[in-house]
Amino acid sequence: MTYLFMILAFVTGLFVQYLIIVSIVLIHELGHFLMARLLGWRIEKLMLWFFGGVMVTDEHLSRPIYEEFLVVIAGPLQHVFIHIGLFYFGDLLLGEQLLTEAYQYNIWILLFNLIPIWPLDGGKCVQLGLTSLFPFKTAYQAMLIVSLCFIIGILIVGSLYMILTMSGIVLGIFLLQENIVEWKRRHYIFMRFLLNRSQSKQKSKKQIVEVEPSTSLYHVFTLFKRSSHYQLKIRQWDEAVIEENEALAFFFKGHTAQPTIRDMIYFKEMN
């Protein structure tokens, strides 16, 4: 998509405007990158789009929520510094018309990135908020539903009232495709969330969940929130208590196809 907009910029004689937009997007992404590096994250690469970018890292879901929030918010924060830079130095670098356009691009890119659409910063903030309050699996799916509703709503309203440009429609379709792919990947994301928990040494507040022996481990895991560590209190079994790390380890070792709490207890007693 970046190459498409570059070609269009050449053809329409708007290459300087294109460079201004790319510069704003690059500074925005550098905000994410520098904050992530400051927090010691491993970063694979940065990918730029026309109205934003993606910092590819495997640290998501394995870091505390507050760290992810700092990394997310560091991008939009750069637009404040860009505005200050344009105010003090814009006259030296740009003419009056281009300076006005630079202000507008900076504001529009900021507002666009704050829309609650995945994988924009607004969507990521919604995801972090929901996953801090509700079980991860439920929250992640809810975030994607909200995101899809916003995209479809904007495309429908924008098309009916003819307020979307061709580039806006292309961008909307691109984001729609990204969200559909993410929806199809939601089970994989949940499994990655569980795997990270099984390896995590972070200290979280403890919560006790009462479960029946016949309850599947997978169902129990769907109750897990990111910000809590769980102990499973088993009804009708001398009130036995199992730590979540034990349950996750048993689940990932694949002793049975659909392990239950009872399966795990029998296995522990036999060993």
Where are these regions (language model features)?
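Juxtamembrane/interfacial segments flanking transmembrane helices
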Residues: 42-46, 114-130, 187-189
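Membrane interface segments of multi-pass transport proteins and intramembrane proteases
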Residues: 88-98, 128-143
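The conserved cystathionine-beta-synthase
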Residues: 209-229, 235-271
